[in-house]
């Protein structure tokens, strides 16, 4: 395991490859889905996978048991692919009823004679009853944790027998559901298998590393009290010498504890996620041995102060970790709760690591063990939620919750990646309705506190959070002082400042009375712009607001981490790093600062650059101080006492030229865990209207880039009528506003954005501009002319259609808009599926050329579009921008313009490729360019 983990840490798979694999590796109809053992953390050698085709029948009127279906004969003609929930596309069965019956033949191998045989269900939602050859084996009520029934007395080894399963998933207000509105988990949704066990099998083997990491405590539990004296043996199979330890369990005992010294044990960490492989065997005279292969990570989870401060942080092995997490809804478009292949499940974890995150929050879903296994192997922390119910806080609901909580901790105790258990989310299911009010009553708060204490009694080695709070609710007893907030990017700096000022031991902020803050790490546990704008955003460029938030977080070291919503899109939220099909989204960062990626925004060594807005305004020639803040959240001493800061300042001007302004190199102080403001950069602005980018690189002494960042400055002023180009050519300049069209017609729609900032035409059609010949310009002095414009294709988004459709139901339960472009704030972010168009340019009736328009993009490159956004709770095509078109104007068209006194410039989109056209003005898009004619002078 260790060797694989190291290889994986050194090799980054292309994310495009990972995304394409999502669909490419779905199971074939003739194969067994998910053939791997579902419990790498607890597996026996003799097992048989029961995934695959089962007979299936719905039971809408609950008559199947009376009709004798338990004996194995279901109505003929239907089948389902296990372990996919009915209703999930991969199951092959539509969601038509609340009760489903499964049946199949099983054959226990002859070689299993003399052993106890069990059928094991990874998870089945919700009330599951099982029969073998008509004999009922038992019933399990719960949808998220494993259970098993013994077949031994009924087994006819080597012969076919009928296994029948009935699952009742009838809705109840107390039933745990989480966000199954994205796709219901109905019936069996994890691997089902047969397993041969010894005479008194192990029920659990839990490893608890000692605080000094020099040994491990081991707690073993048997399924039944020992019928005679038994011996338990542990063998550490990948430790030098394969050491073994043994303990005796006396007759009648059902548990054993061992303290095993492991001096100089290899530790588990995010950088080196080593796993200790262990074989546990229990045996006794005349009793078949039971052997389980398992593993653990030698690591501790605790809370320590950030060195040099009294700010509490989560720590792994005593070293603070600045948490950079993503909310993982853990949904697959074809399998819902169940991912089609193990490699796709692995890649979910790998994606997070590749963009520089150090953890995921498995959101109100108890995730499949193999996903946790991959987190263990790849070194990604897991915050694990218990699913919620949607009804009232009654005793039935709390019983369901406790059953799931106990099962989750029992199953997942050995996963070193799991650092915290989250009991409740946003007080869902905990409020009592009285009229129009939803109240979080003291009795519910006390119950939540008791659940926290229960979890701590079950697992004292991890952090426990009572309630991941939001929306005015507070904590009770908790190990983490977390909070949710969804804000526009411009509000983050003031918000985090206020929270930092109110975070201290004894503070009442973020807690329900009479509870108070103690020494809990303060962290954000959900953020994003998705709910930061009125009515949600739909699909938008999240990267600009994200950048502003991360800069704000890094300026405030009391904040011990953050958690972005979300890893991937779902059916009604589109703010994921990846889309629901796991195709990539483009941030545009690498076009602004060469080599910059999301990893730079997640770097342990971080320089926050510029003002909280990420864009400020200045006048031509003004000297501007650019603030710098160093957030060095690393204990590394490899860099000495200083690092190199390199700032490259460049600008785009009104002629569409990129001009280099300055390069500034300085040394900045370094010490481990340093958080401090640095001396600002003083930058002189260009003497003309421009978009200025201050691109910063943090380097070590060898020139290795450690982090990249940037800020922008909009230099205002009147553009020049005469100028000199970068190649020395002198030009006269004539311009017109983007919306100053003299004629236009579009097959679908035409509209403006923010008054005169941008002009859109959807479908096929044209815009026609008339640009006057410059006063006093002698035609004989003109050597040539070029038309300059920023343009893109223009998709007709759902919000742009003339429709009065409203969002439906509750977003948290799958409601809302299911069109990513329908929300009034939406403008789909640049991604892997471009929206092309093409524009034909004619000047005074003469063909000047055709240009391909690659896309209708929106990302961080739309600097001016973001700078133009009003602070009114809405977005107006934020981040959208075009490509810079330079179209030489034919001499005949220039001559006609000289005679007529104007250039008639027509931009046409043909109906053969009706991809629309957007024209950007000088205060919108990427470049400070209006539709412009450059007359090159002789």
Q: Positions of the model-derived regions?
A:
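Beta-strand-rich binding/interaction modules
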Residues: 132, 215-250, 256-258, 623-668, ...
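Extended carbohydrate-recognition surfaces in non-catalytic/accessory domains of CAZymes
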Residues: 25-120, 171-181, 185-188, 306, ...
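Low-complexity, Pro/Ser/Thr- and charge-rich linker/hinge segments at domain boundaries
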Residues: 186-206, 299-316, 711-743, 928-938
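Extended acidic/polar, glycine-enriched regions
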Residues: 156-158, 221-306, 688-713
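Short strand-edge motifs at loop-to-beta-strand transitions and within beta-strands
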Residues: 102-104, 145-149, 254-260, 677-681, ...
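Substrate-binding clefts and catalytic carboxylate motifs of secreted carbohydrate-active enzymes
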Residues: 45-65, 124, 184-187, 200, ...
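Accessory beta-strand-rich segments of carbohydrate-active enzymes
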Residues: 40-41, 57-59, 92-93, 97-202, ...
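Active-site-adjacent substrate/metal-binding segments within catalytic domains
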Residues: 83-108, 112-132, 138-141, 199-206, ...
